[in-house]
Amino acid sequence: MAKTDLARRVYNHTWKLDPIIRSLLDTDFYKLLMLQMIWGLYPRVDATFSLINRTSSVRLADEIDEGELRAQLDHARTLRFSKKEMIWLAGNTFYGRKQIFQPEFLAWLHDFHLPEYELRRKDGQYELHFHGPWTHTTMWEIPALAIINELRSRAAMKNLGPFSLDVLYARAKAKMWSKVERLRQLPDLKISDFGTRRRHSFLWQRWCVEALKEGIGSAFTGTSNVLLAMDTDLEALGTNAHELPMVLAALAKTDDELRSAPYRVLQDWNRYYGGNLLIVLPDAFGTAAFLRNAPDWVADWTGFRPDSAPPIEGGERIIEWWKSKGKDPREKLLIFSDALDVDTIEETYRHFEGRVRMGFGWGTNLTNDFAGCAPQSIDGLKAISLVCKVTDANGHPAVKLSDNPQKATGDPKEVARYLRFFGNEERVEQLVRV
């Protein structure tokens, strides 16, 4: 792949529109895996996705021009999957499995396009919503976040000259490479790129992926970004997300259906996928509640992704649960992915080394760590905690509790109802940085 002069590319913004999203494959792999299941099992469910800025001190509508945001969103709606992309999806092997995507699904995907959006400004923030069939609105999550984060980066750098930009990217590259050198010291490390949604830019994410590929070799197991996986001959990685249990819980008509929603998701998932894709995401309504009510067969799955508890605490809780089910944790997999950086990766790796198989999904602090890199102080280069969550399913409010109350989303009355139902034990409030 040809190298790009990042500083020169940023400085030479003389074209009318520089599209941030240039392919529908510029998304996380698990969105396609989930989409196939949604298409197959829930084609008549409507779902609304909404932008949520958890760093409320950052006034996005004051930093990002509304016209530029609309232009980028409008451009993304013009995209279709190309013939090359469809051939790759049909013919490539994912997780050791050929034809993971059904021919009927790919035929439907051929004509796919992103649905309309609803955008307005309020109190210095953007209210951005995507209404419509779940099969379509789900695919807005990643491009919407990538667009807003990159527009914010562009706005922060627009007054920097070519030499200042050179210094910025030189320092960011050196900072990234110092992390690579530390990761080399972990002999059995398995780490992947999970940084699409909050990246500084697509080109910077590509540079980081190439740096990891060269710098740590086989310890770098792949990327969640489907386009980068295709272009760089890497594994496309990802399992499933909170939206699945959130939607099924919102659709529940009885207490039994609500209680069983997280496990019905796993049963649905098992109908479509197996092996290393059998990874449990337990924290949508609190990991403690999930483990307390989990059927025994959940312990047979390949592993867990503890996503919102502190990694060591969350990992220990799952290991103890496996042991209570008669399972050997050394044969199981824990994937850590919440707000990781080198310090937490090293600490977590050394804590669990030899006790459990581990994987690390490295996100924001891989693809958007520019702190201290600019020649002058620029607040707009600091990563923020921005998410796009399902907020409604067939007219019913959707809720996420999380193991960290700071990450809870949904109507406050519904959040309170879910807390009464699932319980509040072992949820620990932590500052959400990214």
Curated annotation (Swiss-Prot):
Signal peptide: none annotated. It catalyses: nicotinate + 5-phospho-alpha-D-ribose 1-diphosphate + ATP + H2O = nicotinate beta-D-ribonucleotide + ADP + phosphate + diphosphate. It is an enzyme of class 6 (ligase). InterPro entries: N/Namide_PRibTrfase, NAPRTase_N, Nic_PRibTrfase, Nic_PRibTrfase-Fam, Nicotinate_pribotase-like_C. GO terms for biological process: NAD biosynthetic process via the salvage pathway. Pfam families: NAPRTase, NAPRTase_N. Transmembrane segments: none annotated. It comes from the Bacteria. Transiently phosphorylated on a His residue during the reaction cycle. Phosphorylation strongly increases the affinity for substrates and increases the rate of nicotinate D-ribonucleotide production. Dephosphorylation regenerates the low-affinity form of the enzyme, leading to product release. Its EC number is 6.3.4.21. Gene3D superfamilies: nicotinate phosphoribosyltransferase. GO terms for molecular function: nicotinate phosphoribosyltransferase activity. Pathway: Cofactor biosynthesis; NAD(+) biosynthesis; nicotinate D-ribonucleotide from nicotinate: step 1/1. GO terms for cellular component: cytosol. The modification Phosphohistidine is found at residue 242. Keywords: Ligase, Phosphoprotein, Pyridine nucleotide biosynthesis. Belongs to the NAPRTase family. Catalyzes the synthesis of beta-nicotinate D-ribonucleotide from nicotinate and 5-phospho-D-ribose 1-phosphate at the expense of ATP. This is Nicotinate phosphoribosyltransferase. It comes from Brucella canis (strain ATCC 23365 / NCTC 10854 / RM-666). The lineage of its organism: Bacteria, Pseudomonadati, Pseudomonadota, Alphaproteobacteria, Hyphomicrobiales.
